[in-house]
């Protein structure tokens, strides 16, 4: 997969107020279903989530809106072989079609993450259940991460917290780690 980060002047987005930008529109991002046939699969309006990002503009210049576009579904490896400029132009064109943003981005960055997202296959939930049962039989052991309940940051944080609670409770009961 690749993340294409695009920076636009706030005024490039129709309806965005000079003082409020995309946040004033109530936009945070969107997902694109595979059946739509688009390269971009998800868009996050980063300056809505992290308003301080709008302050990266030159002092006195118009604030920027930072947008992250995710591309690269399973089977789309050839898409990721395109040059950075081509990926940025493609993401910008699809963003314009979806949002009406005007003009080209003033800056962009392409970050590639080959093999970054696990592609769960049929039977994944059953395998996870078996793993969790086997791990539960080993006191003090826990598993977490994108391989289990989801690849998104919230899912990873949730599994990490659950694993931390399991291990902490084990340690609080006064048991020691066993090696062997």
Range-by-range predicted roles:
Residues 79-83, 153-155:
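Short, solvent-exposed loop/turn segments at secondary-structure boundaries
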Residues 40, 51-62, 111-143, 147:
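FAD-binding beta-loop-beta segment adjacent to the flavin cofactor pocket
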Residues 73-76, 88-136:
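Flavin (FAD/FMN) cofactor-binding core of flavoprotein oxidoreductases
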Residues 122-180:
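C-terminal lid/capping helical subdomain adjacent to the catalytic/cofactor pocket in oxidative enzymes
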